[in-house]
Amino acid sequence: MTRMAHDLIRPPKARRGERVAVLSPSFAAAGAFPAVHEQAMRRLTEVTGLIPVEYPTTRQVGAAPQARAADINAAFADPAIRGILAVVGGEDQITVIPHLDAGLARRDPKPFLGTSDNTNIHHWLWANGIASFYGGSSQVHLGPGPGVDDVHARSLRAALVTGETIEVTDPGESEDVGVDWGDPRALDCFGDREPTGSWSWHGPARLVSGRSWGGCLEVIEQVLTAGRFPFGPDVLDGGILLIETSEELLPARNVGWIVRALGERGILKAAGAVLVARPPVSDFERRPPAEERARLRAEQRDVVAGMIGQYNPEAVVCVGIPFGHTRPQWILPHGGAITVDGTARRVVADYS
């Protein structure tokens, strides 16, 4: 594994019966849709054996950034809290970051799980020397539907409790959106699922093992624009770049623009491998026919893989892994080790 200059701590795991904070660093979906949230909390304990603890802004819709940051700081400061989970993403977490206390996180690092807008916190932790886990929105992946998807439950337990190494495999089905959380059917029904195809591999047939960095592409752009990645691209040398896109459904052309900017920043050249998540291509208002959905996914795949190839033809690229805004979702290490085998076409994640 390539060693990078910026060392990262991997927080210790929780033990069954211990407490984990459930926070709303962005949108407080727990307050807007409490029935789904409460089912998520029950399932969290069933799947992990851990006890969820809510904070003042967990259910407070519209809480100020300072108040949300105070809850994050309090969770890191409490020695009884052994992990932190975000309820969901949002769109203004960038305003929370200036109010966080890095000293508290460094004194008692603990696993943090979240996706989408929580890319802000992942990068704040990474910059302060703490690894985390990308994925795990309780409002999306624990509360809705008849149960928790197997791949999500396995990676959730690994991230919080067991720390095992797992091969990341395709679940065989996917949904872009579930049932509206305000609809009682959300507690019992999945969204419209469709079969998935094979992942798409690009670049040389070689094995790359390194630590991961990345997240939601639209938020990575914000992080870099705000100057909150205070390193040169060499700190990512040989690592695994994670890229996924949000429910905003950016056209492939716009996605390509952001990826090209990462290339100009030197980030694509530094990566040993790139994992690109299966993108959502529909929402509640826009549900194209199956052929159009397949075309939209292929268009993004071709643009992203082509752009990476221009800047780094030696990178191993795998497109289609469900670690982003679709469900079922794998939680992946952020700052931890991932092995991408372009020869055997396998991906293995170390959750220690």
Kindly label every feature range from the protein language model:
Residues 85-94, 99, 115:
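N-terminal glycine-rich "phosphate-gripper" loop used for MgATP/nucleotide binding
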Residues 212-254:
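Oxyanion-binding "anion nests"
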Residues 2-80:
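ATP/NTP phosphate-donor binding region
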Residues 100-125, 131-140:
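Short, acidic/small-residue loops that bind anionic groups at enzyme active sites
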Residues 252-352:
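C-terminal active-site/capping subdomain that shapes the small-molecule cofactor and substrate pocket
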Residues 134-217:
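Conserved anion/nucleotide-ligand pocket segment
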Residues 22, 84, 117, 220, ...:
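Buried hydrophobic positions in well-ordered alpha/beta secondary-structure cores of metabolic enzymes
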Residues 80, 105-111, 128-130, 271-272, ...:
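A short helix->loop->beta-strand "cap" motif at the edges of active sites that frequently abuts
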